[in-house]
Every structure is written in C-alpha cells, then in structure tokens.
C-alpha cells in the first residue's frame, strides 16, 4: 500500500505542521490510567512510554540507548527499494520492524553491528505490551529523542502490521560510501539530497562504537546530548587532528581531540549537491528541528499508507528547550570553516570563548 510521491509529500508537510499538544494532553478519550488522548488506540502507548523511560532509557536519559535507537529506526526503514520491486524482486517492507522480527538475518548485515542487545530489549518490550515491532521502533525513537534537550517532538503513527519479511541486504548506506552512492540509495527510497542532509541531524546526538574501537563512543560533535546545529558547524571545520592512535574505518581527521568525523559526513558537507543545504543547517536550531521532523515523518511511513495509521503523537513527551545559540568552538574562527556553498555566504555565527575543546566519550 503505497501513496504517490506527491500525496505522500503533501501529507508529510501537513503532519509536520500539525504539532501535537503533549503527552496525554490533546484529546477527548480518557485511558484506564487517567491520561487523555485523541484515540483509544493510543492508550496502550502510555504504558509503553513508562516502561521505556524507566527501563530502556534508564530514567529518561539521553545516552547510548537513544543513539542505538536512532540507528535502528533508520536501518529498519531504509530497507525499502522500489527499484528492486520494479525489477521483480522483493524490495523490502520499509518501517515494518523487520530488524526485530528477523534479527537472525538482519543483524548479520555489517551495518547492523553492535545492535543485538538493543534489538532484543525492544523485542521484549513489544511482546510484553502486545504492540507491533514497526510501531515500537518509531515510538521508542520519538520517546528517546524527547530525552535530549532541543529535540523536536516527532510524529508518531500507530497501526503497522507485525507481518514482515527480512529486508534485502545492502540497502543501508554507510560511512564509507561515496556521496553518489548515498544519494542514489536514498533517492531510490524517495528522499531528495536536501532530505538526506535533514535526516543527518540525528548525528547531532551520535557517537561511534565500531568504526574505531580505540576511541569507543567518541561523539560526532561537541554536544552529543543536545540536539543542535553543532554537528553541521563542526563537520565543516578543517580536519587537523587524529583523535585516536590511528584512523579507523571511514574516519577523517577531526577539528579537535575526542571528536570522530565520518567520511560520509565530511563528503556530504562539501559536495556541490548537498553543501548549500548543509550550510543552511548551521545557524538555526529551530530550522534544523523542523526539517528533521518532516524528514522523519516521511521515513516513518515507508512501505505504509499513512492514512491507514492512527495518529498518537499526543503521547510523545516534549523535550526540554535548548536556548544556546550555535557557536564556532573555542580556539577556532570562521577562517577554520571550509565554506563549500558557492551561492550563499556562510552565516554569521559567534565564536565561543576559551581554548580548543577536548571531548570525552559520549555516555
């Protein structure tokens, strides 16, 4: 059940603009636990919310489980290829939870290394509450991001079937891919180059574990527990430092000690097809959040008809606001930015005081 690209885009924009009220604050149905919501089908998600925040997120923390779910939500949904379908092959079910349902197959994909414990923990939550794995992945992502200051409240739609097939292999773009390979793969799934850049806002909260084990959990920007534009700014800084004893897989020099730079991020930040969109994400946390929310809403319904799903966004908590302005890190200036957008000047961004940062591993 697939919508046309035009109708999908229109629906996503409408959904992105219709911001929900807050957890249990936007509807006329009273759940058994006393919460208020827009639809009785949403009531079960309050129980899942409590379970996730207490156990999975270890007290509503913005730490490693959030980073793992951000990998899982992308790796699950991007297993979707209309090109394979057109060639008469199974093209994947999109955001169907197959990474959990068929973990014996999908966790063997190289891109899914290090996700086994998280996938199995999610499986237990889904079974305990009787919810589909596809719905659970989307819900856990929205809840996890709500624990990180500055994050937008993501849309959450429920009603995905728990029936799925294993994703075809080799559909997950990786840090060692070329820009062309990444854009082609994402384009096959329906995403423009601009939307690829928008989705990479998730790297604002990211760290790496398997690309260079010597610097385990090294963050991709200086604020890995805050959803902000520092990732886009810092990826444009000149690479001058090797943060570990040697460079890892798909690793580039970084701007200061402790920060990990993925080759794919560095290339996308400087490629003519994506550089201007990248630069436009550096100066406004609000714009970044709006664009990420819209792109995630689109990704969350890959393989599904959003009109057949139920909007339970009002169950999702709101993140604490982030009022900090974007900055060029201390010890550096705008001259250290590798400006790559020829059509627009680099935005005016203040420089932080103090010395060059040295980052600790992300929690």
Curated annotation (Swiss-Prot):
PANTHER family: CATALASE-PEROXIDASE, THYLAKOID LUMENAL 29 KDA PROTEIN, CHLOROPLASTIC-RELATED. Coiled coil: none annotated. Disulfide bonds join 31-43, 42-312, 62-148, 276-341. Residues 1-20 form the signal peptide. Heme b binds at residue 203. Glycans are attached at residues 162, 358. GO terms for cellular component: extracellular region. InterPro entries: Ccp1-like, Haem_peroxidase, Haem_peroxidase_sf, Ligninase, Ligninase_C, Peroxidases_AS, Peroxidases_heam-ligand_BS. This is Peroxidase. Its cofactor is Ca(2+); heme b. CDD domains: ligninase. It is found in: Secreted. It comes from the Eukaryota. The record marks 71 as: Transition state stabilizer. It catalyses: 2 a phenolic donor + H2O2 = 2 a phenolic radical donor + 2 H2O. The gene is CIP1. SUPFAM superfamilies: Heme-dependent peroxidases. Binds 2 calcium ions per subunit. Binds 1 heme b (iron(II)-protoporphyrin IX) group per subunit. The active site is at 75 (proton acceptor). GO terms for molecular function: heme binding; lactoperoxidase activity; metal ion binding. Keywords: Calcium, Disulfide bond, Glycoprotein, Heme, Hydrogen peroxide, Iron, Metal-binding, Oxidoreductase, Peroxidase, Pyrrolidone carboxylic acid, Secreted, Signal.
